[in-house]
A protein has these predicted regions:
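Fe(II)/2-oxoglutarate oxygenase catalytic core
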Residues: 1-105, 109-119, 190-198, 203-247
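Conserved beta-strand residues within beta-sheet cores
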Residues: 103, 116, 127-129, 165
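Residues that flank catalytic or metal-binding motifs in active/ligand-binding sites
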Residues: 102, 124-126, 175
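Short, conserved beta-strand element in jelly-roll/cupin
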Residues: 108-110, 121-137
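Short histidine-centered beta-strand/loop micro-motifs
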Residues: 96, 115-122, 141-143, 169-171
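Catalytic core of Fe(II)/2-oxoglutarate
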Residues: 137-223
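Hydrophobic side chains in beta-strands
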Residues: 73, 108, 132, 145, ...
Length: 247
């Protein structure tokens, strides 16, 4: 089994794994491609309805101009909103068959814009892009993982390991929209809760505690204790929170 790598660990990702994956190796994703005509209208209607609700995404400072925006419904195993599930029941029905789904969002990249090179949070997931509105293919619009470029196609999955440095661009005159989901890789599936809790712990510490002077000045020992406390709370609370929201 490969080891789990985390961006926030500070360790160098070894880059000894596949950059891209093929959807025909994942039956539950292939089913969605087969039913694309059935779910296309549902997704496009929802995107039109929520057009003004997309939020600028500046993860790792790669989107300073604000041309990359998203609507997030599930974030590292935590359900932020069940609106997608209510408004897109057909799509949701097929998504339920995907093991290890931990993140779900809609991503829009404006015309004549790009997302700078960056790495994802961990190699424990497979990032999956389903093309919804794809104005054109390579070389004008595409994704680069490592040194390999691929274009999106409407109704087709583009699957990749976002622990690799990757970037995206859209040099066309129209916006590009994809459905993004992250699913825990099969070999790490038994560690799903731990993976989600750990990444959420990094988020809490970096975005909340990390900016406070007392925490910044605290010893490595104290920081480890705080990490352990936050991790334990999230490890227990996150599944309970989701149970309450879906019951």
């Amino acid at each position: 089994m490969k080891e789990i790598w985390y961006y926030e660990s500070g360790n160098t990702y070894p880059e000894n794994e596949s950059k891209y994956y093929e959807s025909n190796g994942f039956p539950q994703l292939a089913i969605i491609e087969e039913h694309w005509t059935e779910i296309k209208e549902e997704l496009k209607n929802f995107i039109e309805e929520k057009d003004r609700s997309f939020q600028s995404n500046n993860y790792q400072g790669v989107n300073i101009e604000g041309n990359w925006s998203s609507l997030t419904f599930v974030f590292w195993g935590s359900m932020l909103s069940n609106e997608f599930h209510k408004k897109c029941p057909i799509t949701t029905c097929y998504l339920k068959g995907i093991k290890g789904l931990v993140s779900l969002s809609l991503s829009r990249l404006s015309a004549h814009s790009s997302i700078a090179r960056h790495r994802g949070d961990t190699n424990a997931i497979m990032r999956c892009h389903l093309g919804i509105d794809v104005p054109t293919g390579l070389p004008q619009c595409g994704l680069k993982v490592g040194e390999e470029e691929r274009g999106w196609q409407e109704g087709k999955w583009t699957l990749f390991n976002d622990a690799y440095i990757h970037s995206a661009w859209n040099n066309s005159d129209k916006g590009r929209v994809v459905l993004i989901l992250d699913t825990i890789r099969l070999e790490f599936l038994n560690k799903k809760n731990s993976i989600c809790a750990r990444i959420l712990t990094y988020q809490v510490i970096n975005n909340k505690l990390g900016r406070k002077k007392p925490f910044k000045k605290s010893s490595f020992f104290v920081k480890n204790i705080v990490f352990g406390i936050v991790f334990t709370i999230l490890y227990i609370y996150r599944p309970l929170q989701n149970f309450i929201k879906t019951s």
